[in-house]
């Protein structure tokens, strides 16, 4: 099932909550069944300070498990579990009705236990990022976007700074675009530790 609830305690504040649950069972030869469970939930708050600025903060939780249920012994043995906690914040401010500053940050805690790991081991990693972007419109024809992002990846103690610059110039019905950027993507726990 999936449910979503929206509540507005103030004209300037919107709260959103969601929850979901999933269960499936599959019979196997003998007295064992595969069981699959998923649970997810989250909360988000949007606050509008004024016509120029707003803030969004949120938290999400996601868990997916697989287990072998031995009906003879009524034993439920979990052999796979993935649990994620995610927190994010995003702030926007508009200058003169046409230039926008955006800043934000994210944090993720990822836990994974799997039968595909050596000795059914488990691993945990933390990733975090902070970013800022300025959308500048000096004329009706010219748009410039400049941004900077910082990423942290706990498993390798990696820190990475990624710049971005983009420009667009309109000539009649045509638009000329150019951009430069760098990026970073941390590997997942599955990519790092699973033995296939």
How should these model regions be labeled?
Residues 74, 80-94, 100-104:
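Amphipathic, soluble alpha/beta structural segments
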Residues 1-84:
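Flexible loop and strand-edge segments within Gram-negative outer membrane beta-barrel domains
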Residues 2, 12-20, 55-69, 100-109, 111, 154-156, 160, ...:
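Surface-exposed extracellular loop regions of Gram-negative outer-membrane beta-barrel proteins
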Residues 8-12, 48-52, 94-98, 108, ...:
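Outer-membrane beta-barrel channels and translocator barrels
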Residues 26-27, 112-114:
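A short acidic, helix-capping loop that chelates divalent metal ions and anchors anionic groups
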Residues 3-7, 43-47, 89-93, 130-136, ...:
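Residues on the lipid-exposed face of transmembrane beta-strands in outer-membrane beta-barrel proteins
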């Amino acid at each position: 099932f999936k449910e979503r609830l929206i509540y507005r305690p103030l004209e300037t504040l919107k709260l959103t909550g969601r929850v979901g649950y999933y269960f499936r069972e599959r019979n196997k030869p003998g007295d064992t069944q595969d069981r699959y469970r998923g649970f997810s939930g989250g909360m988000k708050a949007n606050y509008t300070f004024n016509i120029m600025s707003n803030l969004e903060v949120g938290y999400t939780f996601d868990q997916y498990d697989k287990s072998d249920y031995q009906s003879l012994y009524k034993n439920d043995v979990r052999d796979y579990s993935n649990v994620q906690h995610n927190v994010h914040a995003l702030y926007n401010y508009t200058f003169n009705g046409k230039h926008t500053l955006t800043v934000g940050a994210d944090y993720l805690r990822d836990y994974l236990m799997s039968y595909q790991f050596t000795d059914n081991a488990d691993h945990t990693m933390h990733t975090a990022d902070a970013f800022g972007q300025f959308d500048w419109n000096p004329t009706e024809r010219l748009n410039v976007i400049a941004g900077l992002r910082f990423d942290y990846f706990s498993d390798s103690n990696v820190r990475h700074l990624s710049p971005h610059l983009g420009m667009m110039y309109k000539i009649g019905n045509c638009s000329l675009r150019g951009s430069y950027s760098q990026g970073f993507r941390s590997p997942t726990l599955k990519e790092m530790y699973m033995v296939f």
